[in-house]
Amino acid sequence: MEFSVKSGSPEKQRSACIVVGVFEPRRLSPIAEQLDKISDGYISTLLRRGELEGKVGQTLLLHHVPNVLSERILLIGCGKERELDERQYKQVINKTINTLNDTGSMEAVCFLTELHVKGRNTYWKVRQAVETAKETLYTFDQLKSNKIEPRRPLRKMVFNVPTRRELTSGERAISHGLAIAAGIKAAKDLGNMPPNICNPAYLASQARQLADGYGKTTTTRVIGEQQMKELGMNAYLAVGQGSANESLMSVIEYKGSPDADARPIVLVGKGLTFDAGGISIKPADSMDEMKYDMCGAATVYGVMRMAMELNLPLNIVGVLAGCENMVDGRAFRPGDVLTTLSGQTVEVLNTDAEGRLVLCDALTYVERFEPEVVIDVATLTGACVIALGHHLTGLVSNHNPLAHELIGAAEQAGDRAWRLPLGDEFQEQLESNFADMANIGGRPGGAITAGCFLSRFARKYNWAHLDIAGTAWRSGKAKGATGRPVAMLSQFLLNRTGLNGDE
């Protein structure tokens, strides 16, 4: 789908469709008023008849409006004018894209980007429109024998901006939005792939292909079980020893900074391509969704793709910690004591708390990069879902400025996160009689104690942990990976470069 920006008046547009907003109750937006004026009150007359109230998401498609050059006008309800916020704006864009796609409008000029959204500028409105449009049209049908496609799908979208001086900002917003949307799609495609296809070797192959596609700035190396054993990554190895699929850790290095020696930002993604729980086996209900336990790695993959697409002037290392937690006679057991790469020992009380065992060795491994910051991303705890539901990503950090930076990026991107505490009183729950620590700390504060566990392996750098157990995928009729938090981390990186669209 093609996106562009322009600045022009609605009456001069020759297009299959013009999209304008209507506020509640039956109030035309300024652009809709212009169209109403040149059509001699045609639109306002329809509203007075009760054809459209203006509630969020309501639509009315008009054909051959008098004196209007475009074939059709789509009126879209935007709610109350003073209450139009970012969430409602995205809902309006989503409904617009679906309506255009379903009604055969192959191209459209959209004036919704001229609406006032509280606290948001033109760059944000255009970028979010692009990202939302791509999200709305996303399908995962690679494995279906019969693919259903619209007869006349939407192919071109033009976003109008109020003034010509905002064209540059709008064009930058499209560029950023397309790159972020591509990263989100890549993460969703990986997450939605079934575990008989997407195993650790598949993750590694995708990492290699990513490096091959972006030339000299990017390299990938894959660390297998033999090298892990030589390094002493015994916690990581233990998790995968019950699986027929070899554990593989893919390390993607992107060097985009003009200073080749600049310290990198390191992203570490949990990549459990299937998590049966091991000996502490999960219940059968919804176990199929444990293919999504690699969405942390999928996120890192998507963010790396975004950074390469935009040639961000940063050095970034992305780690996809691929593994599979299965049950057989070789599987690790509750009661085992593991010596991690850091030298610290861990008593395994529950084999279904395996993600932190993989991550702890990965977090120690990345010390060699002398990172500026390290951010790990993981579908780590059901406790985080209980605490924050499916709307907010959980965040813990050992560095207040980094935590504030991430929360700010999350708010900017509309991919929200909430910081959880990281205190000594929670660390006490991890005490073990037989090792330096246990791998679980009981039910109370489970998302926090998981973060406390990881913090013990991140003492040598500024670190943050994102628990995406509640936000990485949806269940039910809309089942599928969400691609979160690619948008948040992309915004974080854009902010680091100064290319964040602030005006």
Curated annotation (Swiss-Prot):
Its cofactor is Mn(2+). It comes from the Bacteria. One of its GO terms (cellular component) is cytoplasm. CDD domains: Peptidase_M17. The keyword Signal does not apply. It catalyses: Release of an N-terminal amino acid, Xaa-|-Yaa-, in which Xaa is preferably Leu, but may be other amino acids including Pro although not Arg or Lys, and Yaa may be Pro. Amino acid amides and methyl esters are also readily hydrolyzed, but rates on arylamides are exceedingly low; Release of an N-terminal amino acid, preferentially leucine, but not glutamic or aspartic acids. Its EC number is 3.4.11.1, 3.4.11.10. Mn(2+) 2 binds at K270, D275, D293, E354. Binds 2 manganese ions per subunit. The keyword Signal does not apply. One of its GO terms (biological process) is proteolysis. Mn(2+) 1 binds at D275, D352, E354. Gene3D superfamilies: Leucine Aminopeptidase, subunit E, domain 1, Zn peptidases. One of its GO terms (molecular function) is manganese ion binding. NCBIfam families: PRK00913.1-1 (NF002072), PRK00913.1-4 (NF002074). Belongs to the peptidase M17 family. HAMAP family: Cytosol_peptidase_M17. This is Probable cytosol aminopeptidase. It comes from Sodalis glossinidius (strain morsitans). The gene is pepA.
